[in-house]
Amino acid sequence: MLPLYVVNNHGQFNHLILRTLRDMDIEATMISNETPPAEVARGCRGIVLGGGPTLERAGVASAYLDLGLPVLGICLGLHIMATARGGAIRRGASGGFGAVEVEIFEQNPLLRGYPDRMQVWASHADEVSVVPEGFVRLAGSSICGVEAMASPDEHLYGIQWHPEVSHTVNGRLLFENFDGICSE
């Protein structure tokens, strides 16, 4: 079985994403966000767009959305997804760093098994302000209106929080669910 690729967008938690997947016995490899899309398409069964400081340092990561593979965008990965598909981001009114209670508005395969409210760990200043056409807003919080979104037809999923850190309650479930999506 092909691995998942974790795209390094220069964020503080990208290596932790990789480590979490490997600790879960999910085969995963980290790649640069400058890896040619054709190479990515041949080498994996799903993509995790990790976090990072700015869209300007996202390399060619937005091109990976067009490969027909399932994609999970985390933090900056969500922003890459939103802007590449016609949405918008902005500086959040308060930003988020620390524990946040997220409310799930709509269940889907990525969020399967989670309760309607859950504690997550946030570490961001920007947020999605306009959800792209074809996407559904799945979750929000008091500090961020779009905590999760998805385009089910394209198998594109984005979350603002960090499931890879221990402060997110049951964060590994999200990776299990994404691995299942990539194995379908």
UniProtKB/Swiss-Prot annotation:
Keywords: ATP-binding, Glutamine amidotransferase, GMP biosynthesis, Ligase, Nucleotide-binding, Purine biosynthesis. GO terms for cellular component: cytosol. The active site is at residues 75, 162, 164. Catalyzes the synthesis of GMP from XMP. InterPro entries: Class_I_gatase-like, GATASE, GMP_synth_GATase, GMP_synthase_A. It comes from the Archaea. This is GMP synthase [glutamine-hydrolyzing] subunit A. It is an enzyme of class 6 (ligase). The gene is guaAA. Pathway: Purine metabolism; GMP biosynthesis; GMP from XMP (L-Gln route): step 1/1. The keyword Ligase applies. Pfam families: GATase (PF00117). It catalyses: XMP + L-glutamine + ATP + H2O = GMP + L-glutamate + AMP + diphosphate + 2 H(+). It comes from Methanoculleus marisnigri (strain ATCC 35101 / DSM 1498 / JR1). Residues 3-184 form the Glutamine amidotransferase type-1 domain. Coiled coil: none annotated. One of its GO terms (molecular function) is GMP synthase activity. Heterodimer composed of a glutamine amidotransferase subunit (A) and a GMP-binding subunit (B). Its EC number is 6.3.5.2.
